[in-house]
Every structure is written in structure tokens, then in C-alpha cells.
């Protein structure tokens, strides 16, 4: 397959060109065009590396916590329509049995593949979080951080776990963080009431990422910088839900200036109502009302989002002064780095997986390719 005459978005520039895809890989950039090849005309379109969502609970009426392969597969198909080619199905603070069941389904999807976006691994959001920063998690199922409880949750599927969100200030967290690092799992700081010094201690133990910046964490104050201050004061990565609801765009711009775009990932934190009409849904077993693009619990707390990554890219591009290639890095390369797959995903480079998105000047997705296969065309 050849995609010809498109605007190729590299990590540092955008250039007109063509690419050859063979055996699921980017074989050559600017190849000789053979008339016998299957050709996609990319004229007036942009070719981007596929988006990578490291924090997503559901889409299209399906939830990771459904605990079955079918739901993971359906989510993968829905988000592929919006340019996502890899993702981390994200669990909630539910019972150990329910999380274990979901991890098993994620491990199955990782091993056997899906019909849409690739499953790289699981992101466990909880259950080792603070009851004081519960957000839309269920306080009944919070667990004290412990290596034994973590092992009970993942069972034989530790290799399927990519990241875990936890609160570093809670007793037992430091030992668990060290264990996670030793097992090549990314510990992320989130749903945490930590003070600045406690957050810094967690970072020293091995925390290298932070979950949905500004949301469900202690805010910045000039005398107590909190978790936000610790994120800004160190080189750990962070992620933003860039829907204009979770974070004001002025706050987004400030965060990007402080961290630099190489340290920020765009995520959706989407729940099952993503790509569905407004109405009543659930998230991790809790009732959610979706109205005017916002998902909330009955008490008013935000409950994930209905954001897609193409919309996140569009929002950031339209509300900042960053060039398109930098914004795309936030939605692709940075996620690949967190997932430790940046040697084969996250950029357009010869030898890399042909996980690609073609979109127009308004960032409307026209084609999505996963491993060189067209999984969506408008």
C-alpha cells in the first residue's frame, strides 16, 4: 500500500511526501510509486502517527469494567474512528474480583488482538487511592496499597499491566511503587491528597507519571505547592483531559509552558457514553448523567469524559500556539514513551508499525490504519 502526496507529520516538522506500507510496517518514506500498488491519494490530507490513549474507560456503550473481550473489542473499534490506534483499557476502583476479571479480558485482547485499536496493556486506576480525592471512584472498594493485594488483582497477568494510578501518601504505597518499578510497570500519582513533600517522596520512590493533571489532586498554593507543584517542579510526565470542561484552557496553556509539550500526554478518560447520545450511563458501577458533553455523578462530580483524541488534538491546537506536529506528539509519541513502545510506535519512521491516521485541515479523520490495515475510512 502507498499513501501518496500527503502532508507527513514528523516529530519536528511537516513535509509533503508519500509512504510505502508492507507487512504492517512503514517500509519506506518517499518510495518509487508503482502503479500496481494499492494507492491512497493523500492530497490535501495530513498523515499522522496513530493516537495513543493511556487513560480510557470505555466508549460506544461499553466499559472496560464489563470484564469481557467483546467490550474491549467494541471500544477498540469505536475509538479507531477517531484516530486512536493503541490504548490502555482503564479499570476503576471496584471489587478485587471485578478488576481481576477485567484484567483477564485486557490480557486476552493484548495477546489475541482486536478489530480496531491495539491493546498495549492495562491501566489500573485504583484501588490504591485516597478516599479524600475519590472523584468518580467508588469509596467502598478502596484498598490499602500492598504488594500482596496487587498480586491478588493481577493474578498471572502482571505482564499485561502497563501503569497504575495510586496515592503516594498512603501507608504501603512506597513499597508498592518500588515493586511496580522493578516489574517495569509505570506508577502514576493520582486521586491523591498528598502534600508537596509527600508527592516528592513518591517521585523519589519511582513515580514517573501523574494522572489527569489538576483533577483529583491537591492544587498549587504558593505556601503549599501540593501535588500540582510537585509535578511542575520535577521532570515526571503528566496528562491532560483537554475537553474544556475538566481544565480551563488558560490553565492548560500554563501547564504546557511549565512542563513543555514533551512531558504532557493528551488522554480522554472517556467512559461508555463516548460517541453516544446524552443520557444515563454508568462508570465502574456508579450512575452517570451525560448532558451537554459533560459526564457527572448525581452529586455533580465529573465522571470521566466523552472526549475522543481527535477532538483533544483539535482543542489543544485551536487553543494554544503550538505547531500541529508538537500537538500530535502529545497524542502519540509521548504515550508511546510511557508505554515503552516508542521503538516501534508513536512516530512516522521507516521500520515502525504502520499505525497511522489521515485527517483533513480541520482534523476530521478520513482513514485510520492499524498495523497497515485500514480499520476505518470516512
Name each region found by the language model.
Residues 6, 337, 348-378:
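C-terminal cap of metal-dependent C-N hydrolases
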Amino acid at each position: 500500500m502507498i499513501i501518496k502526496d500527503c502532508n507527513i507529520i514528523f516529530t519536528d516538522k511537516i513535509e509533503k511526501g508519500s509512504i510505502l506500507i508492507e507487512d504492517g510496517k512503514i517500509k519506506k518514506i518517499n518510495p518509487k510509486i508503482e502503479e500496481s500498488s494499492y494507492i491512497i491519494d493523500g492530497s490535501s490530507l495530513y498523515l499522522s502517527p496513530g493516537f495513543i490513549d493511556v487513560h480510557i474507560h470505555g466508549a460506544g456503550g461499553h466499559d472496560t469494567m464489563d470484564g469481557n473481550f467483546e467490550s474491549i473489542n467494541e471500544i477498540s473499534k469505536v475509538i479507531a474512528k477517531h484516530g486512536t490506534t493503541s490504548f490502555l483499557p482503564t479499570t476503576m476502583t471496584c471489587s478485587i474480583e471485578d478488576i481481576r476479571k477485567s484484567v483477564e479480558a485486557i490480557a486476552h485482547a493484548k495477546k489475541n488482538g482486536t478489530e480496531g485499536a491495539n491493546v498495549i496493556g492495562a491501566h489500573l486506576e485504583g484501588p490504591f487511592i485516597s478516599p479524600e480525592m475519590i472523584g468518580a471512584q467508588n469509596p467502598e472498594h478502596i484498598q490499602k496499597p500492598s504488594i500482596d493485594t496487587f498480586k491478588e488483582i493481577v493474578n498471572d497477568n502482571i505482564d499485561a499491566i502497563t501503569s497504575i494510578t495510586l496515592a503516594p501518601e498512603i501507608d504501603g504505597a512506597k513499597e508498592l511503587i518500588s515493586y511496580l518499578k522493578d516489574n517495569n510497570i509505570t506508577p502514576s500519582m493520582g486521586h491523591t491528597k498528598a502534600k508537596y513533600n509527600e508527592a516528592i517522596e513518591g517521585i523519589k520512590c519511582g513515580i514517573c507519571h501523574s494522572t489527569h493533571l489538576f483533577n483529583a489532586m491537591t492544587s498549587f498554593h504558593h505556601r503549599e505547592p501540593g501535588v500540582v507543584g510537585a509535578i511542575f517542579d520535577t521532570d515526571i510526565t503528566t496528562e491532560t483531559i483537554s475537553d474544556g470542561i475538566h481544565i480551563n484552557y488558560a490553565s492548560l496553556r500554563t501547564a504546557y509552558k511549565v512542563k513543555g509539550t514533551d512531558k504532557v500526554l493528551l488522554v480522554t478518560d472517556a467512559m461508555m457514553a463516548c460517541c453516544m447520545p446524552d443520557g444515563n450511563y454508568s462508570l465502574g458501577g456508579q450512575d452517570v448523567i451525560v448532558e451537554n458533553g459533560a459526564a457527572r455523578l448525581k452529586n455533580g462530580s465529573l465522571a470521566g469524559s466523552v472526549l475522543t483524541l481527535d477532538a483533544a488534538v483539535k482543542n489543544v491546537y485551536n487553543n494554544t500556539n503550538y505547531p500541529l506536529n508538537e500537538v500530535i506528539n502529545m497524542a502519540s509519541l509521548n504515550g508511546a514513551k510511557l508505554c515503552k513502545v516508542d521503538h516501534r510506535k508513536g512516530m512516522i519512521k521507516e521500520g515502525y508499525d504502520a499505525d497511522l491516521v489521515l485527517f483533513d485541515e480541520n482534523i476530521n479523520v478520513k482513514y485510520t490504519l492499524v498495523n497497515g490495515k485500514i480499520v476505518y475510512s470516512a
